[in-house]
């Protein structure tokens, strides 16, 4: 029997699992509806006999008779043929049920007292049954119905506790019919003397039973079947019991299925508070296993024991306590499940939205994600609207002449889009979800973005509701202007008013003919009016002509100019494209910047000419306009007209102010386009187009007057002069000089209004450099070692860079190849080498420091401005050349002060890794180390000379096109001359201490090797740069003196440096190879110090030569060599006296 019970339990578990997979919401609703309709089909279960023992309960009572028990058990068994044992009935009648409270809504369930005879309960206490593992069931046929005895053996604790178990029963037979039993309530009251009671009940196996649990909203969940375990309890007294169903009035119908194989309970709970009854009984000895369903519902079952025989139930005495209200558990309803699905779906979409908007690595809460998504959508809508506007403007601008005749492009664009904007705003407000948080604004513009201020074009509150342009401010096309000028000229030339007046006088004379016949005496008949009759028609004619001409001027220069209101939609469109042009210039996208600037001009009503006829008309009109603006009478008349217009302003700001503002904006746009054309950033156009843009910028800038700063006005005139100089060449060179002088006159008498970045043009050297056309503006300028990179789209900045390099080259050339100047007596005298070089370097330093001080005419972010701050690269070269000149002059203090600047090499030069920069740097360090006052100065200086010599040789071997070849040559020659002079000075310091006059100190092998290497670099440089020849003979004689070679050849080389030449006997190009004054003085000093006395023609010749060398060195400024020469003169004075005696 135990095996069969276990087999039935296993089958029930399998069927329950299958039921959980197959049940749906409709099936369970039909089941509950079917159960609720069983009251009419089974009236015996709800008879008054069952409810008689519950006084006052109304509809909820219980029965104590055996008939109710028999009927319920028969209904429960269905088709079972088993009969109820009479002993069971007799023992059941001894149970008395107390009356229940009439309140069905009470939180405490009604109590039931079960009395057990004390004689039937053994006194020996029993331990809690041990749950044994379940054995493997044997397969048995399911067609045979078996009877099993189920024993429920609870163990009670010493503390009295009350537990109420409400378990309505559902029995399902093979024919799938349901029978409903009323809920039964069993109250077990225990005490310390109560012993374990074994309740054994015989039930019949029912096929295909399922255990279901109904939640508050009707969702059914499948529960796993309870495990049936067989517990052996041989000492427990068994009493046959027939369970009597009871009826209580509660909020819900609790259904319980009992089965002989120990299948679990199916409870349909409507009130969630009753789910606490499914928790395990909290006793000390009762162990109740817990089962967890698939939906997380916790169920409890009691351990059962399979008995052999039926035993009666003993009455258990004890008191009844009120039950505690069940604790409210976690709500597990279908509504929560559906909400959980919705939340999961919403969370997935929010995560996907976050990945699209902010990326996968961003961390932000849901409201922040939604807010950012809304902002991004608004941004996309705004960008879409902007692109739509720009597309429409460009389409209208491409139409050549049809839309340019008296039509404002900005007004057309805005009027066509107004209706679309209103519809789109309504759609956006309808589609927009509510605010993501309480802090969001209730009303917002559909185009506003939280991260940036809204554009006036997209915010109706910021754009004034006023007409874009009245008909008088639309402007005229240049062809119409030229046509009006031609008609006016023809009217004044042919003067039809004169003919009309003459025709009127003739008509009056015809009306009064001479009547009568006869002869008349010839005589002079004087008119009655006199001279007034002759003057009146002339005055009237000139007055009418003057009115006509003035009207034409007012129409062309005042009413013909397009004017844009400051807060109109056209103005906003213009500024949007202007700012976009600035951004394009900052990125280096010059084509896009030019497109935006052309769109700006089209919005202002000043589109660029697209055909040759339009270009000719525009150029002619600008020439006429510039000529008219120079007439004071015309300017005075225009001012009076503006004052009259100011009395009745069309807008609040006044027509004159708006006209000047529009002229300023157009002038700056023309100026930027002109700069891009000059620098070659745009496709090359015709020279007339460049002249047209230059004249437009100049005319409109002069019309703007105080609206445009003086520095910008000067820059516009200089750019116009530069454009005429580069594109027109010598044909219109006089116009370039005119605009340059005009720019200088705008700076004021003391150049107070000129910006620092343009101050170099006010210097005579700057003017000469600008007008001699020794510069060129390139589209892609190469990087230079001598100046920092200037703005590639600013032609003035490029010319300034070329001027700075020209000054640096002049400063170095004055050291390595000084130029001769002619005096009044046709005698040539070389200028002072060091003074000229220092003057150039001083000018260069002042012009370099003034770079970029001017304020840009456009926004501060524009790239069309000079680099802010001084040119640190050019400043470093200035300091390096100053150190070289100071060392050659013997000014040790100046060398130390400027060497601190040379030590800080700019990063731009360090990145280039140029060997020439390293050579000049180590040469400066060698000169600084050779100064007196240092312990190891000579050795350190020699080491730096070696490094500089190696870098110089590397720079001569570098092949490739350089940006400044002439400047590279002079710097290489200067570096080589400095190294050779420094080596010579170190050798002479070693020899001057102990050697007498006329004797030579021989240098070491390392010194000679280094000198030979530098001399080889000088010879190599002389092949490509002829001025290096003037240094070759002197240094060759020096190395022979250091090595102690034959003095004959040394004397010849020195004689070559001392020889004077005239310009008549030389050819072109040989003048650069002549030695300078400093070379001649150095040669005299070497000959008098190191050559033997026999090589001089007379004993006094050495003193004469030294005196001449001293004068030359003093004139040049070489104080160190001059001091040495004077010391030798003093020594030679005593020696000469001795030799003469």
From Swiss-Prot:
Region span, Interaction with LMNA: 237-491
Lineage: superkingdom: Eukaryota
Positions of the record's site feature: Cleavage: 468-469, 484-485, 522-523
Residue ranges of the region described as Leucine-zipper: 380-401
Lumenal domain ranges by topology: 501-533
Protein family per UniProt: Belongs to the SREBP family.
Positions of transmembrane segments: 480-500, 534-554
Keywords for the protein's UniProt record, in alphabetical order: Activator, Cholesterol metabolism, Cytoplasmic vesicle, DNA-binding, Endoplasmic reticulum, Golgi apparatus, Isopeptide bond, Lipid metabolism, Membrane, Nucleus, Phosphoprotein, Steroid metabolism, Sterol metabolism, Transcription, Transcription regulation, Transmembrane, Transmembrane helix, Ubl conjugation
Protein name listed in UniProt: Sterol regulatory element-binding protein 2
UniProt-listed InterPro entries: bHLH_dom (IPR011598), HLH_DNA-bd_sf (IPR036638)
Segments in the Cytoplasmic topological domain: 1-479, 555-1139
Distribution of this protein across tissues and organs: Ubiquitously expressed in adult and fetal tissues.
Gene3D superfamilies: Helix-loop-helix DNA-binding domain
Segments for region (Disordered): 48-144
Extent of Polar residues compositional bias: 88-97, 114-126
């Amino acid at each position: 029997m135990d095996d069969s019970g276990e087999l039935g339990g296993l089958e029930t578990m399998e069927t329950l699992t299958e039921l959980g997979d197959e049940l749906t919401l409709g099936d369970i609703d039909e089941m509950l509806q079917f159960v609720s309709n069983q009251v009419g089909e089974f009236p015996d279960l709800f008879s008054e006999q069952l409810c008689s023992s519950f006084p006052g309960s109304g509809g909820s009572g219980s029965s104590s008779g055996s008939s109710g028990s028999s009927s319920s058990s028969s209904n429960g068994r269905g088709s079972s043929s088993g009969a109820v044992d009479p002993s069971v009935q007799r023992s059941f009648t001894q149970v008395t049920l107390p009356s229940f409270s009439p309140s069905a809504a009470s939180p405490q369930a009604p109590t039931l007292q079960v009395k057990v005879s004390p004689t039937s309960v053994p006194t020996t206490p029993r331990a809690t049954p041990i749950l044994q593992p379940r054995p493997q069931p044997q397969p048995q046929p399911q067609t045979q119905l078996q009877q099993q005895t189920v024993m429920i053996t609870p163990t009670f604790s010493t503390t009295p506790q009350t537990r109420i178990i409400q378990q309505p029963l559902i029995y399902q037979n093979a024919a799938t019919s349901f029978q409903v039993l009323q809920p039964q309530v069993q109250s077990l009251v225990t005490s310390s003397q109560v012993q374990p009671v074994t309740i054994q009940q015989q039930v019949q196996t029912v096929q295909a039973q399922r255990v279901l649990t109904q939640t508050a909203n009707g969702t059914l969940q499948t529960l796993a079947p309870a495990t049936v375990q067989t517990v052996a309890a041989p000492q427990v007294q068994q009493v046959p019991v027939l369970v009597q169903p009871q009826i209580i009035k509660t909020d819900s119908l609790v259904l319980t299925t009992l089965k002989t194989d120990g299948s679990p309970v199916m409870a349909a709970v409507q009130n969630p508070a009753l789910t606490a009854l499914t928790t395990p009984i909290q006793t000390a000895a009762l162990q109740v296993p817990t089962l967890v369903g698939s939906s997380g519902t916790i169920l409890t079952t009691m351990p059962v024991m399979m008995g052999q025989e039926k035993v009666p139930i003993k009455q258990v005495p004890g008191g009844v306590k009120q039950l505690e209200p069940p604790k409210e558990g976690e709500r597990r309803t279908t509504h929560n499940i559906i909400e959980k699905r919705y939340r999961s779906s919403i969370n997935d979409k929010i995560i996907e939205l976050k990945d699209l908007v902010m990326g996968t690595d961003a961390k932000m809460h849901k409201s922040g994600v939604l807010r950012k998504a809304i902002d991004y959508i608004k941004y996309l809508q705004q960008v879409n609207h902007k692109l739509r506007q720009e597309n429409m403007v460009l389409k209208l601008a491409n139409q050549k002449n049809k839309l340019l005749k008296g039509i404002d492009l900005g007004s057309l664009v805005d009027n066509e889009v107004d209706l679309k904007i209103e519809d789109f705003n309504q759609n956006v407000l309808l589609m927009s979800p509510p605010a993501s948080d309480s802090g969001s604004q209730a009303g917002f513009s559909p185009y506003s973005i939280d991260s940036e201020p809204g554009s006036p074009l997209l915010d109706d509150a910021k754009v004034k509701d006023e007409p874009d342009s009245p008909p008088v401010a639309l402007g005229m096309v240049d062809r119409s202007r030229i046509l009006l000028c031609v008609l006016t000229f023809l009217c004044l030339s042919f003067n039809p008013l004169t003919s009309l007046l003459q025709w009127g006088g003739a008509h009056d004379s015809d009306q009064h003919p001479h009547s009568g016949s006869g002869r008349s005496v010839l005589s002079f008949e004087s008119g009655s009016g006199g001279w007034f009759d002759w003057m009146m028609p002339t005055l009237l004619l000139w007055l009418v002509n003057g009115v006509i001409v003035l009207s034409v001027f007012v129409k062309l220069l005042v009413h013909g100019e397009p004017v844009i209101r400051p807060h109109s939609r056209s103005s906003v469109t213009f500024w949007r494209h202007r700012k976009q042009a600035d951004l394009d210039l900052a990125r280096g996208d010059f084509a896009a910047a030019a497109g935006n600037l052309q769109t700006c001009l089209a919005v202002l009503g000043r589109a660029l000419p697209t055909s040759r006829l339009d270009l000719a008309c525009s150029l002619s009109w600008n020439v006429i306009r510039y000529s008219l603006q120079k007439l004071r009478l015309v300017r005075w008349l225009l001012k009076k007209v503006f004052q009259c217009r100011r009395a009745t302003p069309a807008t609040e700001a006044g027509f004159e102010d708006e006209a000047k503002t529009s002229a300023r904006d157009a002038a700056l746009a023309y100026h930027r386009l002109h700069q891009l054309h000059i620098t070659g950033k745009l496709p090359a156009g015709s020279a007339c187009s460049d002249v047209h843009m230059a004249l437009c910028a100049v005319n409109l800038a002069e019309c703007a007057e105080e609206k445009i700063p003086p520095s910008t006005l000067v820059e516009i005139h200089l750019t116009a002069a530069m454009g005429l100089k580069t594109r027109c060449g010598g044909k219109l060179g006089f116009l370039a000089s005119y605009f340059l002088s005009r720019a200088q006159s705008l700076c004021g008498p003391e150049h107070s209004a000129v910006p620092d970045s343009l101050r170099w043009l006010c210097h005579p050297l700057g003017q000469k450099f600008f007008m001699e056309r020794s510069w060129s503006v390139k589209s892609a300028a190469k990087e230079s070692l001598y100046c920092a990179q200037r703005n590639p789209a600013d032609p003035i900045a490029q010319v300034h860079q070329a001027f700075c390099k020209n000054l640096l080259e002049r400063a170095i050339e004055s050291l390595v190849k000084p130029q001769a100047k002619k005096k009044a007596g046709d005698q040539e005298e070389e200028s002072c080498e060091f003074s000229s070089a220092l003057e150039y370097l001083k000018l260069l330093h002042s012009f370099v420091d003034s770079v970029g001080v001017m304020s840009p005419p456009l926004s501060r972010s524009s790239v069309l401005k000079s680099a802010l701050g001084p040119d640190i690269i050019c400043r470093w070269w200035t300091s390096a050349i100053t150190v070289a000149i100071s060392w050659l002059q013997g000014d040790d203090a100046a060398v130390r002060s400027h060497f601190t600047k040379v030590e800080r090499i700019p990063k731009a030069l360090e990145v280039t890794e140029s060997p020439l920069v390293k050579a000049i740097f180590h040469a400066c360090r060698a000169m600084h180390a050779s100064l007196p006052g240092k312990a190891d100065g000579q050795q350190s200086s020699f080491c730096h000379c070696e490094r500089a010599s190696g870098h110089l040789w590397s720079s001569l071997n570098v092949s490739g096109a350089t940006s400044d070849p002439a400047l590279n040559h002079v710097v290489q020659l200067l570096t080589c001359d400095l190294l050779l002079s420094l080596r010579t000075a170190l050798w002479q310091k070693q020899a001057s201490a102990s050697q007498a006059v006329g004797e030579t100190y021989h240098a070491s092998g390392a010194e000679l090797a280094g000198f030979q290497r530098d001399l080889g670099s000088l010879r190599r440089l002389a092949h490509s740069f002829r001025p290096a020849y003037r240094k070759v003979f002197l240094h060759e004689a020096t190395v022979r003196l250091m090595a102690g070679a034959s003095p004959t050849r040394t004397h010849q080389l020195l004689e070559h440096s001392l020889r004077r030449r005239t310009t008549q006997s030389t050819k072109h190009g040989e003048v650069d190879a002549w030695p300078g004054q400093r070379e001649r003085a150095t040669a005299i000093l070497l000959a008098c110090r190191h050559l033997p006395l026999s090589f001089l023609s007379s004993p006094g010749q050495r003193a004469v030569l030294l005196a001449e060398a001293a004068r030359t060195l003093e004139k040049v400024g070489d104080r160190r060599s001059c001091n040495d020469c004077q010391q030798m003169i003093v020594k030679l004075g005593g020696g000469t006296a001795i030799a003469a005696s």
